Amino acid sequence: SGFTHFDEKGKAIMVDVTEKQDTVREATATGKITVNEEVFRAVKEGTAGKGDVLGVATTAGIMGAKRTSDLIPMCHILPITKCKVEFEMVESELAIYCNCTVRVTGKTGVEMEALTGASVALLTVYDMCKAMDKKMEIGEIYLVRKSGGKSGLINNGYKKERKEGEK
């Protein structure tokens, strides 16, 4: 169906959603940060020098989702009605996974808000732990699921099942 953010002359535009119906829309994005053993332990035990890493990262992820339209030029400003940021720690991978779920009743979806929320949360983990690990890697950020609107349900699922009980 082509790119929607360009006019017939190739100039960037914000898509006109005026005539679209308000519907409940929800999106979940995920990503992960891999860390060394020292960081993993400090985050899990709450002993990182800068404080409660996952608590601060949760707040940052919510703030990131709310500020998406300030960061992504063609994103509409949306009245988000729900934003939930959750972490899962998988010791066998020395990885901290982040899920961000965003909901809105509106004319356009919240995929970018969910992706931004997960990204900002993981960047915050990086920022708070960079003194302990110079080789952390953020990756595998993608849309897991979205619902509502013209596209209906899109379920990409998780790329890899995480081991049960490792949270």
Residues covered by each model-derived region:
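C-terminal binding/interaction regions
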Residues: 1-54, 59-167
